[in-house]
Amino acid sequence: MLKRFTRYVTQSVAGMIGISVYVLADTFFISVYSGADGLAVLNLILPVYGLIYAIGAMIGIGSATRYAISRAKGKNTEHYFVQSVTWSILAAVPFMLIGIFIPDKALALLGADAGLIGLGRNYVRIILIATPFFMSNYTFTAFARNDGAPSVAMIGSISGSIFNIIFDYIFMFPVGLGFSGAGLATAICPIVTMSVCTIHYRSSRNHVGFHWKKPSFRHLISCCQLGVSAFVGELSSGVIAIVFNFLILGIAGNMGVAAYGVVANLSIVAFAIFNGLAQGAQPLISESYGKGQPTQVRKLLKWSLFVCLAVEALIQLIIWTSTDTLISIFNSENNVQLLNYAHIGLRLYFLGFIVAGINIVLVAYFSAVDEPKIAIVGSFLRGIVAIVICAVILAKLFGLNGIWISLLAAETVTFLTILFLAYKDRRKRIKRYCSLRSQ
């Protein structure tokens, strides 16, 4: 089992880092193309990415988790994949309409001024029109992982990212499409990933069914209950970006927002690593839970937490020893004010990952063992409630530094709450495991 765990986690982390490169590649090339204004635009757009990814993750990962549990119990799962893709496409329709008709208003709502709207209009339009691909991408990769093919999901994600990096440059500079070129490359990226995942679905090792069944709200809700933690995990970056952008605009203006853009984009990689760890362990935990193997479930949780702590230590080492080097990647103009803001921000903000990684693993664990209550509470606390409250209060008390440190405060509150709820429900959990073992 340790070999399987290592393989699943390693490949899932690699795949998630690949997905995070969607935004990082844009950030790098856009910073070269238009400097601090480009960074500010992209950072204002991050909440849009967050919401799109969140809905796609809730439907795709939730459906794949329910698929793994149901299949382990011997239930019919032939329609799960098609239902997931169908609901993903339906959920994407409002985003497409906004992209076609009112991209300017969407940017204004996110806090962009006239200059930034003019710079980012076409980029937002392209991204929103491509929403069905972004959302469905989660279904393709999550079902592949839960069907015993994490390597295919990883290769798909990395292939998409490589395409994005290469064609970001080609579309923006040689072709001369500028900002729009970055959006076009990013929009095609998930299509590449899904095409690679299709290799597994057409192979003899595939167990995923493709039977059509009328879309069912009951089935959707059942799956989304297990995908809420993934939803909030993805949405949290968007919520944090919105709250931080408005708070920072009032304290440090556009340059402060640009500095947060550097911090936020580097944090995407850290979140991707922990989400990859959680999503890599999830299929194995769900499988063991569905088969009534509590000892195996606990062992998988311990391994996940151990890896999490090791990664957290490594991240802190990199951040504190290479702060200015990391910032320089996105500071093509060598702006001193941007460097000063981002230097302090990066170090203080990343202290939150000391606890954030553990919370991500715990939330995914409770979803994997069909305990949506703890997963949902933990997800909403760390992704929305606690971070918003802490950011607003600490910003008033300590200004910009208070905003940077709010992630650590919010994650600490979440961790203590999860521990309390887990301890409170421990007897119910023991009874449920006993009933599973007797089946």
What are these regions (language model features)?
Residues 7-26, 126, 137, 160, ...:
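Transmembrane helical elements of multi-pass membrane transporters/channels
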Residues 60, 126-145, 153-161, 182-197, ...:
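Short runs within selected transmembrane alpha-helices of multi-pass transporters and secretion channels
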Residues 21-40, 107-114, 170-177, 238-265, ...:
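Helix-terminus/linker motif at the lipid-water interface of multi-pass membrane proteins
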Residues 99, 142, 168, 172, ...:
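Structural signal for membrane-spanning alpha-helices in multi-pass inner-membrane proteins
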Residues 51-54, 164-168, 194-198, 268-272, ...:
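Hydrophobic transmembrane alpha-helices of multi-pass small-molecule transporters
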Residues 1-13, 67-130, 177-228, 285-352, ...:
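Short alpha-helical transmembrane segments in multi-pass integral membrane proteins
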Residues 39-97, 134-152, 259-317, 323, ...:
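Small-residue-rich hydrophobic transmembrane alpha-helices
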Residues 1-34, 47-62, 66, 89-96, ...:
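N-terminal transmembrane alpha-helices
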